[in-house]
C-alpha cells in the first residue's frame, strides 16, 4: 500500500467519524475557514514574485503566516497588543518566503511561515491556546505532505493529505491543551493540599 493510499483511507475514516470537525472547532478554526484557507494556499503556491538577486516572495507563505492570526481579532480583548497581530504575521510570511532557497524550497518556507506566525501570536500577547492551536493545525498541514503533493499537481492528493494533516494537528493541539490544563490543575490541587496539611 502506497503512502498516499494510506493517507486517503485514514483521512476518509477520520472524516466519516466526524473527527475533523470536532478537532477543528476545538482548535479555534472552523471547517469552512480551514477549507477556504487550504484552497487559497493551493492556488497561491503556483505563483512567485521574483525580486532582485534571485530572491522570490511567495504569496502562499504570506497567506500561511497571516491566516492563523486573522481569526484572533475575534478574541482581541484578550490580547495585550492586538495592533501588532497582522504586521507581525505579514513580516513573518515575507521573511520566510524570502528565505525559501535556504529552508528546503516551498515546503520548508511554508513550514517556517506557520512556525514564525505562532511566535508572532505569542509576541502580540495572544493566549496560548489561541496563538498556537490554530497555528499547529496549519503547521502540520504543510508537514503532512502538501508541498510534495503540490509539486505533483494532483489536487485530490493535495486535499486528502491536507485534510488528514489538519485533523491530526487538531487532535494534537486539543490533546496538548488538555494535558497542560490537567497538569496545571494537578499542580494547584497538590499545592493546596500541601498547605492544608501544614
Label every model-predicted segment.
Residues 24-30, 51-57, 75-85:
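Interfacial helix-loop-helix linkers and transmembrane-helix boundary segments
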Residues 10-16, 38-44, 65-70, 89-96, ...:
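Hydrophobic core of alpha-helical transmembrane segments in multi-pass integral membrane proteins
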Residues 60-62, 66-67, 72-140:
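Membrane-proximal helix-loop-helix units in multi-pass membrane proteins
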Residues 1-11, 50-63, 104-115:
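Structural signature of hydrophobic alpha-helical transmembrane segments
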Residues 31-55:
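A generic, lipid-embedded transmembrane alpha helix
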Residues 1-21, 125-198:
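C-terminal transmembrane helix-loop-helix hairpin of multi-pass membrane proteins
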Residues 39-47, 91-99, 137-149:
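Aromatic-anchored segments of alpha-helical transmembrane domains
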Residues 14-27, 66-79, 122-125, 180-184:
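C-terminal ends of transmembrane helices
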Amino acid at each position: 500500500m502506497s503512502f498516499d493510499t494510506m493517507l486517503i483511507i485514514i483521512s476518509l475514516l477520520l472524516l466519516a467519524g466526524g473527527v475533523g470537525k470536532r478537532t477543528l472547532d476545538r482548535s479555534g478554526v472552523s471547517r469552512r475557514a480551514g477549507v477556504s484557507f487550504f484552497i487559497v494556499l493551493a492556488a497561491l503556491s503556483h505563483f512567485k514574485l521574483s525580486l532582485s538577486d534571485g530572491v522570490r516572495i511567495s504569496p502562499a507563505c504570506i497567506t500561511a503566516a497571516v491566516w492563523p492570526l486573522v481569526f484572533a481579532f475575534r478574541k482581541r480583548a484578550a490580547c495585550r497588543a492586538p495592533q501588532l497581530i497582522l504586521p507581525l504575521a505579514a513580516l513573518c510570511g515575507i521573511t520566510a518566503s524570502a528565505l525559501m532557497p535556504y529552508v528546503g524550497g516551498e515546503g520548508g518556507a511554508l513550514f517556517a511561515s506557520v512556525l514564525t506566525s505562532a511566535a508572532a501570536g505569542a509576541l502580540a500577547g495572544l493566549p496560548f491556546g489561541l496563538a498556537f492551536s490554530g497555528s499547529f493545525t496549519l503547521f502540520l498541514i504543510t508537514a503532512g505532505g502538501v508541498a510534495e503533493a503540490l509539486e505533483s499537481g494532483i489536487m485530490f492528493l493535495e486535499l486528502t493529505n491536507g485534510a488528514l494533516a489538519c485533523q491530526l494537528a487538531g487532535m494534537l493541539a486539543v490533546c496538548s491543551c488538555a494535558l497542560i490544563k490537567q497538569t496545571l490543575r494537578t499542580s494547584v490541587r497538590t499545592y493546596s493540599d500541601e498547605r492544608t496539611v501544614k
